[in-house]
């Protein structure tokens, strides 16, 4: 009887494994894999241009990174649509202007991007660094980014970018 049970269990396990093998999704075509790489590369460029445009105080370029109904959420501040996002950033940085453009900058790391057709999500971390009066670099903020993207008119754009701090920064400072 033990031998019979052992055979039944063994057959059941291997049958289950074999059934699981057959339920795996078919491998993606070379074209689909290439499209995924190109999509992730384009989304990565949007994420990097976020920092580049902020650091250059290029508010028009910054706003163009967002979809027509894109949303930017940074703490208690938020705006929807490129014009409102541009206005928000201009207001924040006029109140909290950097000493000189080019003396502060963003760095991004630990990104993951998941693409699903014409939509995507991404998680990343970033740091905002400034030079003090002594020219030494100081960390102003460390941030978690939670992003949603949409392909709009053939280009990837932020559908929503939400910032969540991982380390304190001085009150009222823009990122």
Predicted features by range, described:
Residues 106-108, 140-145:
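Short, surface-exposed coil-to-beta transition loops
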Residues 21-52, 56, 60, 64:
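Short, low-complexity N-terminal intrinsically disordered segments enriched in polar/charged residues
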Residues 41, 103-104, 138-140:
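Transmembrane beta-barrel outer-membrane domains
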Residues 1-4:
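Positively charged n-region of N-terminal signal peptides that target proteins for export
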Residues 21-22, 119-123, 142-172:
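Short beta-strand edge/turn micro-motifs at domain boundaries
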Residues 129-139:
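Short, cysteine-centered beta-strand-loop-beta hairpins and adjacent loop/turn segments enriched
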Residues 6-16:
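Bacterial N-terminal signal peptides
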Residues 59-127:
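A solvent-exposed, acidic/Ser-Thr-rich amphipathic alpha-helical stretch
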